[in-house]
Structure formats: structure tokens, C-alpha cells
Amino acid sequence: RNFMRTRKKKTAFESRFLELYPEFMAQAEEVTRRVCASSSYALHRQCIRERRVCHGDYSQHNLFFDREGAVAVNFARCCFDVQISDFYQFFRKIMEKQGWNQKLGMEMIHAYQEVRPLGDAEFENFCIRLAYPEKFWKLANHYFNSRKTWIPEKSLQKLEILDMQEKKRREFVKFLH
């Protein structure tokens, strides 16, 4: 952010990013406080101790379907973690594409719980993950790791789409509490 602020001639992406930054930073700080006050650390340590395996990149790109059901592929990011993290990744991407539709979100959560019921700590962990503005920080990371002399128009478009979806995402997160 300091790099962007000190630039005399800002790109449209940089100007828009700086406008949105305070809101998303406040959200990230609030989620950090929630994590510290929650049982997330203990849950994470327990999952590692119990060697609970997560895919690590669970998305529609790594799922194939045949007559017998779904098959997950590409386990390059496989790790020990809280298993709800795989569902969270899949869920967030679907919800972004579906405009954070509350009905769909609740149907997905209920379907997941029919197969693998969530305890209170896991559900809290899921809600905390959803509350974190991951997409904003992903765009920020992409910007800071790229050549800043030329920023693709697509980056600005993604930032604008994120801003438009943000209210719906926050409403859904609030609805879950």
C-alpha cells in the first residue's frame, strides 16, 4: 500500500485498490482477532496431530465425474490441516460464481453436513475463513508480485467485481452467525 501511495502517477487499479484498502484491512484485522479468540489454533494442532489429510486445492478444476461418482486429482498441495479447509475453498469459489446466493450456500452446507457433520469448532473455523477477505488479498499479492509497469485491465475488472460482490459476501457471513 505504501508503494502505491507514494507513486505520483497511479494506474486505475492502484487508485481503486487504495480506495478499497481500509475496508478490507479492517476486515482482515477483525478476522485475526476472531481467530485468536476462537478454538481455531487448538483445532488446527489437533488435526495435525491426528494427521487429517486435506487435498489443499479442492476446486472444480481438480474434480472429475464418472458413473461411480466424483474423483479428485492433483494432490500436489496435499497437507495435514482442518478438513473443512477443502470444503471452504470449494464453497468460496462456487459462491463467488453464484453471487453469494444464500439459498445455494445453505444447501451446500447442509449437503456437506449430511456426509460429514461439523462440530462447533469446525463450523466456527469455516465461518472465520469465509469472513476473511481472501479474494482482495489474492489480488493484492498478484499485483505486488507482478511487473508494476503494466497492470492488465483484467486486474481492475477483478477488483471491481470483488467490490460489487462484497456486500453479498458480508451478508452471507453475517447470516451464518
Walk through the language-model features, giving the residues of each.
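ATP-dependent phospho-/nucleotidyl transfer catalytic cores
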Residues: R1-V53
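Short helix-capping and hinge/turn segments at secondary-structure transitions, especially at repeat
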Residues: A26-E29, R33, A37, S59-F64, ...
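Active-site acidic catalytic loop and adjacent metal/ATP-binding pocket
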Residues: R34-I84
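Active-site activation/catalytic loop segments of kinase-like enzymes and analogous catalytic loops
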Residues: I84-P117, L130-T149
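Helix N-cap / loop-to-helix initiation motif
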Residues: L118-E122
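ATP/Mg2+ or Mg2+-diphosphate-binding catalytic cores
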Residues: W137-H177
